[in-house]
Amino acid sequence: VTQYEMHAIEDLGLLKMDFLGLRNLTTIEQTLKLITEIHGTPIEIEKISLDDPKVFALFQRGETTGLFQFESGGMKRYLKELKPTEFEDLIAMVALYRPGPMELIPSYIRRKHGMERVEYLHPKLAPILQKTYGIGVYQEQMMQITRELAGFSFAEADTMRRAIGKKIKSLLDEQRDRLVSGMIAN
């Protein structure tokens, strides 16, 4: 157990692992047991619908107190503006609601509602970014962009993902040159 930042731990040759939401998982497990005890009907969590309109109505009203990743005031405000209608909307909000990508949330919301035009800098980006309204939200999208537009191998794309995700400046600088030359060549 440590309070040190990830890079400091890695520089020492140690592995840092974040265990998030374990208390929530325990709460879910206990809730399922209580439902079975009280009602005599076991609930299979993997069979719970991911597209229940009543659940989306709660998200659309920002009634998410106690829901991991969705309970902050800022997130509730954005959910009310977004009016999520599918599971993908919720996944995107969790991915965007962090320093840096957060500035893209208003544009994401406007694009979802047709209030801002979705444009792609290159035709090859359309199938990659279509589900997220032309905004790169996920690491997997960034990897696919490097493969499609710059000719990166899967290993090279993963190196780029790691450089971006861990903010390793020296590796980013190294990858940028490869990315630009690959895009020019393609």
Segments predicted by a language model, with ranges:
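Mg2+-dependent phosphoryl-transfer active-site scaffold
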Residues: 1-186
